[in-house]
Amino acid sequence: MDQFECINVEEAHQKMHQGKAVLVDIRDPQSYAMGHTPGAFHLTNDTLGTFMRDNDFETPVMVMCYHGNSSKGAAQYLLQQGYDAVYSVDGGFDAWHRHFPAEVEHAFGG
């Protein structure tokens, strides 16, 4: 894959629950803490090394941001780091929350 692909939240949801891809959330720490997709890895500059060490380059990666814009740059960056397949989630966490409101986890006991 030379270029990342965009997928919708339904496709991302299916891939994640089938174990066919990992989901990373690149939003700021406060937004992530207020609500995120269970099982999503919070990918930041500080956690990038851990993510790359713990995840195979062959495992597809789905990148989620706020609305599906910032994730595109992060997806391209991950491709450049050597990941075989990277996807940007259209609509980001906003779309995920609208489609799957029961599947939102809060870090602060919410």
Swiss-Prot record:
Gene3D superfamilies: Rhodanese-like domain
Active site: C65 (cysteine persulfide intermediate)
GO molecular function ontology, one term from the record: thiosulfate-cyanide sulfurtransferase activity
GO terms for cellular component: cytoplasm
Pfam families listed in its UniProt record: Rhodanese (PF00581)
Domain of life: Bacteria
Enzyme Commission number, as recorded: 2.8.1.1
Domain Rhodanese span(s) in chain numbering: 17-105
Subcellular localization, as worded in the UniProt entry: Cytoplasm
GO biological process: glycerol metabolic process
InterPro entries documented for this protein: GlpE_sulfurtransferase, Rhodanese-like_dom, Rhodanese-like_dom_sf, Thiosulf_sulfurTrfase
HAMAP family, sorted: Thiosulf_sulfurtr (MF_01009)
Task of the protein: Transferase that catalyzes the transfer of sulfur from thiosulfate to thiophilic acceptors such as cyanide or dithiols. May function in a CysM-independent thiosulfate assimilation pathway by catalyzing the conversion of thiosulfate to sulfite, which can then be used for L-cysteine biosynthesis.
UniProt family annotation: Belongs to the GlpE family.
NCBIfam families: PRK00162.1
Protein name in the entry: Thiosulfate sulfurtransferase GlpE
Source taxonomy: Bacteria, Pseudomonadati, Pseudomonadota, Gammaproteobacteria, Enterobacterales
Gene behind the chain: glpE
